Amino acid sequence: MAYTYKYPRPAVTADCVVMTREAAPRVLLIQRGNEPFKGCWAFPGGFMEMDETLEQCAVRELKEETGMEVTEDDIFAFGTFSAVDRDPRGR
């Protein structure tokens, strides 16, 4: 019999902030294709798979959403944001 969890498990996401190192820095944004916020500008990112690290998620999502290829060595933690009501889809 499969184990079931007594408590709900929150969804974990990785959002990627990509900046240039130019005199006038630029930031990479994507235009969301799905609800919520369809058509709005956002950082590339998405939900973490059960078998991947946060860094692996960031590498995968950046490639899926922009075609940009980076390695885990290119990724560093910028910040953690955990507001419960941050996403209308819930936790």
Say what each PLM segment does.
Residues 2-42, 55:
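N-terminal strand-loop-strand
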Residues 44, 58, 62:
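Hydrophobic alpha-helical positions that pack around
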Residues 1-2, 80:
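Short Pro/Gly-enriched beta-strand edge/turn motifs at strand-loop
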Residues 10-12, 55, 59, 67-91:
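Active-site segment of metal-dependent pyrophosphate-handling enzymes
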